[in-house]
A protein has these predicted regions:
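Positively charged, small/polar-rich N-terminal and surface patches that mediate targeting and assembly
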Residues: 2-132
Length: 132
């Protein structure tokens, strides 16, 4: 599905040896102020295995309002991102199970997940399409 001019250009280039993943998923995994790093690393490994690769941004900071005290808290968060071509029901269950295990091990009440398009394009095709 072409959403805008950038999507049109990227999908055109992807036809010449690139890849277009119709979806990407991002998981925002708090590190419990670095006390549950093992749980976050395990989640990252599971996502990498399930999706065939992932990117992690380790320098993010997440904030939330403590509902009891009304105070804004912040802590380090790993943003784990992976592209995919639609999961099978079994793969989707495996992903949900990985999220559940992380949440349990890290003692998280909530885990943020988002989804959208993601392109992987060959540089050579990009260079040919946009010669200066």
């Amino acid at each position: 599905m072409i959403e805008d001019e950038l999507d049109r250009i990227l999908s055109d280039i992807a036809r010449y040896g690139g890849m277009c993943f119709p979806s990407k998923v991002k998981v925002y995994a708090p590190t419990c102020n670095n006390t549950c790093i093992q749980a976050v690393e395990k989640l990252y490994r599971r996502i990498t295995e399930l999706f065939g690769g992932a990117t992690v941004y380790k320098g993010a900071i997440g904030t939330f309002v403590d509902p009891v005290r009304g105070v804004v808290e912040e802590e380090p968060v790993w943003v784990i991102e992976a592209a995919h071509n639609c999961l099978t029901p079994a793969e989707a269950r495996s992903f949900a199970e990985a999220l559940r295990e992380y949440a349990e091990e890290a003692r998280q009440n909530y885990i943020a997940v988002s989804q959208g398009s993601f392109y992987v394009l060959p540089s050579e095709s990009l260079a040919k399409r946009f010669k200066t």
